[in-house]
Design a protein with these regions (language model features):
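Mg2+-dependent endonuclease catalytic cores in nucleic-acid-processing enzymes, primarily RNase H-like
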Residues: 73-74, 78-186, 204-213, 217-218, ...
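Short, well-ordered loop/turn elements at secondary-structure boundaries
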Residues: 53-55, 66-69, 105-107, 149
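A conserved active-site cap/scaffold subdomain adjacent to cofactor or substrate pockets
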Residues: 56-61, 65-73, 85
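Stable alpha-helical structural segments in soluble proteins, enriched in small hydrophobic residues
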Residues: 189-201
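ATPase catalytic-site recognition across NTP-hydrolyzing enzymes
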Residues: 4-64
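Short, structured patches in soluble enzyme cores that scaffold and shape functional sites
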Residues: 1-3, 19, 31, 74-76, ...
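Non-catalytic, well-ordered alpha-helical scaffold segments
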Residues: 23, 69, 188-191
């Protein structure tokens, strides 16, 4: 990391705070090859573009403002898995600006957001965005993480912040180095947005996955024609 002049002081400080994690430090501090100890998500595929057959099913929104960025991600269903595409990762965004980013997209799907910001959700809804808060409760974070872990996940190459956070999203450890069942806050923002976006989502039954809405409508029309003929 010392050879990368593009890193901000905040990222450098975050890296150096993890010197006490040998596995992580060996990979990201000293540049050795290997797997990061305590990494929450693994084996995500980085893809150059979203397949034409992929279907946009949700958007995830994690609120931030001054210290933490606001993150918006598109989530596509494709061939039994999900594809993540980063729309925004920026500090200082107002609710109006968040709504404008979402409404600038041609496709309109449900936005799932952090329910800790009910006033922001109401305001963004008032700007014409289909948005709702994610229900939270005991164990909901761990359940959401497990749901994502169980899926085949891909992320677009242009989603540079999401990829960086995916690679650095770790479980907390205690003073003895024991891994705990709680994620670190550092690098969590895009991961939270993804978890919110997939909250409560299930693949539609009897619906062919990995095909576009246009193709799905063609299939439905052909079935109808066969029925009436």
């Amino acid at each position: 990391y010392l050879d990368n002049e593009a890193l901000s002081p905040e990222i450098v400080a975050s890296i150096e705070q993890r010197k006490n994690r040998p596995g992580w430090w060996a990979v990201y501090g000293e540049g050795r090859l290997g797997e990061v100890e305590g990494k929450i998500y693994k084996d995500w595929e980085i893809i150059e573009k979203i397949p034409h057959e992929a279907r946009l099913v949700r958007r995830g929104l994690d609120f931030g403002y001054s210290n933490d960025p606001t993150v918006i991600v598109d989530i596509y269903e494709y061939n039994g898995g999900f594809i993540v595409d980063e729309l925004a990762h920026q500090t200082g965004l107002s609710n109006r600006q968040i709504a404008d980013i979402i409404k600038s997209r041609e496709d309109r799907v449900l936005v799932m957001a952090d329910s800790a910001e009910p006033k922001s959700i109401d305001e963004i809804s008032g700007y014409g965005v289909n948005i709702m808060g994610v229900a939270k409760g005991a164990g909901s974070v761990q359940q959401g993480i497990q749901f994502v872990q169980d899926k085949r996940m891909s992320v677009t190459a242009r989603s540079v912040n999401t990829i960086r956070c995916y690679r650095n999203y770790l479980w907390k450890t205690d003073k003895n180095g024991k891994v705990l069942n709680e994620p670190e806050h550092t690098f969590s923002d895009p991961m939270d947005a993804i978890r919110y976006g997939l909250n409560g989502y299930r693949t539609r039954p009897n619906t062919p996955s990995g095909i576009s809405d246009q193709r799905r409508k063609q299939i439905q029309r052909s079935r109808y024609s066969a029925t009436v003929s």
